[in-house]
Amino acid sequence: MERLASFGNDPFDKPPCRGCSSYLTEPYVKCAECGPPPFLLCLQCFTRGFEYKKHQSDHTYEIMTSDFPVLDPNWTAQEEMALLEAVMDCGFGNWQDVANQMCTKSKEECEKHYMKHFINNPLFASTLLNLKQAEEAQHNETAIPFHPADDPPRPTFDSLLSRDMAGYMPARARLSSRSFDNYAEWDLRDIDFVEDDSDILHALKIAVVDIYHSRFKREKTAGRKKIIRDHGLINLRKFQILERRYPKEVQDLYETMRRFARILGPVEHDKFIESHALEFELRREIKRLQEYRAAGITNFCSARTYDHLKKTRDEERLKRTMLSEVLQYIQDSSACQQWLSRQADIDSGPTPAAPIPSNSGRRSAPPLNLTGLPGTEKLNEKEKELCQMVRLVPGAYLEYKAALVNECNKQGGLRLAQARALIKIDVNKTRKIYDFLIREGYITKA
């Protein structure tokens, strides 16, 4: 009867919720990793991630409910248990009292269901036979064959292998009994208290003894062996290999949090590192998706093409040198002379931008109309005027501005040659953008 009562619908028959101590009603949650006794939570405490002692919010769980059919589509598991309880209370054949106790089924339904599924059902007979055979098989189990293990290493205490294993002795399956501060007694082994010592010498000897006691106490309270055992710090190379699988940012965090490992438990410490590693991966993935979105990419097929083209552009940018820029103007002597004069101006310092006379006789292009162009609302009036004069769309200007500002922050200043290396557009437009950003205080000249 006690076994059946644990499945009843009466909330007073079940333990209360461990979070709010309220009586549990179905459905409720049972932790699959904690217990016995079972760790039960109501849905409200489960949704807010209640944790208590060893129970964590990320444990696996089970939804406890009996509102589902088992033997008959019209009978729920809760009604099946209620029928069995009623038969045990009222006796077999007293179907009227059984129906009155159940309150949901008639006398005929209770009798028909019980006789069909519990008396005349061959499933239960075969189940009992299988249980009996399984019980007999447990007593006839053969012995498990054991094979001799490999001979464990036995390094000497002062060897390099022993230091790498933190003094662990595999043959004895325990750490060495020698202390990490094994030579602390050497400082006081020759101290001798005599009656004719001066007060200063006597106080000095007492201080040395106190220092020894403090070192001994620190060795005892530090619990180095316990930390080594709990965190599994036996194989140092194994931990170094595990650290290398993290990105550099997580490795720096791992190195910083190593000193706090003695405060946190081994599981909590690993969870902390893994959670930050997952956070870093999510941030990097979000940044990558934001880059795709800013480029107008809406599917991963286009994203693969974008990544391939971006990698190609980066490789070409690294191959570019000053010689390649000269070769662009080698066929036009006047253009080459202008480029050389601009490079000379870079070395001599900033000069007011002077219009370069054009021999082509062509008229200058009209200002660009920014109406309706994306990114215009992000510009101030001076930036809009600049984009109109150099005929540069706002989106491209914002991208060039961000690249120049970031490079200036990294280098502590920016030269015009560096700006031209970053922005592969007309050198005259680059010069105007560079001068404008310096004049407005966005960047500083190196």
From Swiss-Prot:
Residues engaged in binding Zn(2+) 1: 17, 20, 42, 45
InterPro entries per UniProt: ADA2-like_ZZ, Ada2/TADA2, Homeodomain-like_sf, SANT/Myb, SANT_dom, SWIRM, TADA2A_B-like_dom, WH-like_DNA-bd_sf
Keyword DNA-binding among UniProt keywords: yes
Every SWIRM domain range: 359-446
A GO cellular component entry from the record: nucleus
CDD domains assigned to the protein according to its UniProt record, in alphabetical order: SANT, ZZ_ADA2
Keyword Nuclease tagged: no
Region (Disordered): 345-375
Record's subcellular location: Nucleus; Chromosome
Sequence ranges assigned to domain SANT in this UniProt record: 70-122
Protein name: Transcriptional adapter 2-alpha
Organism: Gallus gallus (Chicken)
The gene coding this protein: TADA2A
